[in-house]
Amino acid sequence: MHVITRLWDRVSGSQPLPPGWLIVVTAVAALLIVANTGTWRPAGKVITIAHEGGHALVSVLSGRRLDGIRLHRDSSGVTYSRGKRTGPGLVLTAAAGYVMPSLLGAGAALLLAQRHLTAMLWLALVLLAATFLAIRNVFGAVAVLATAGAVFVVSYYAPPEVQAGFAYLAVWFLLFGGIRPVLELARGRSRSRNWARASDADQLAQMTGVPAGLWVALFGLVAVLALAGGATLLAPAGWHA
């Protein structure tokens, strides 16, 4: 019981804000990781986990039956769910993928701004554990376990300074990383009809009658607004207008 109490106090307590230079350095590092193809290729799988996890979470919340998630080496993925073939539940499930990394980043930024750094890391572990239970292929299981393992090691064993750097880097990465897949979606749709037919935006267009281009624009708007809001929350003290 004493161990549980100590753990709860650690998770629910507040931590001091890191120095401004660390916030700026982690923002620049995250932007470089997202912008560089060589680093994006492995790191982008974290965005795929968030993307497919978004489909899965909303499918369950909307009353659909989740059958599983598969993650692939090329950073693509697919989420299987069953339920009504029409209606808001299916639309929300399809729309959740591209916006989820950005929304998670904005939510995590709010926790960091409230000095709940440890809570943010442990909440990430809970979400990764839930995602792992839905994974249905070996590569997906390895990807989620590797991500969760890194979060656990840092949150449990690393000193506060390292935890802060890791947490801020992760949040900036979600915020910046939520934009790149939308840009890739827009570029891919303009180049390939096969991509267009298979994309979330085009599936949403078939469900709703709203043009796929407008769905892509909506995904982009959410990502940009989340980045703007998250950056405002994370900005070092004295930088706010």
Predicted regions mapped to residue ranges:
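Short, strongly hydrophobic alpha-helical membrane anchors
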Residues: 1-17, 237-241
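Membrane-interface loop-to-helix entry segments
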Residues: 18, 91-101, 139-142, 214-218
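Hydrophobic core of alpha-helical transmembrane segments in multi-pass integral membrane proteins
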Residues: 22-35, 124-132, 144-154, 223-230
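Small-residue-rich helix-interface/hinge motifs
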Residues: 36-90
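Membrane-helix interface "capping/anchor" motifs
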Residues: 39-40, 113-117, 133-144, 158-163
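Divalent metal-coordination and catalytic microenvironments
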Residues: 51-53, 97, 204
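Structural signature of hydrophobic alpha-helical transmembrane segments
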Residues: 108-125
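C-terminal membrane-associated helical module and adjoining short loops/tails
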Residues: 142-241
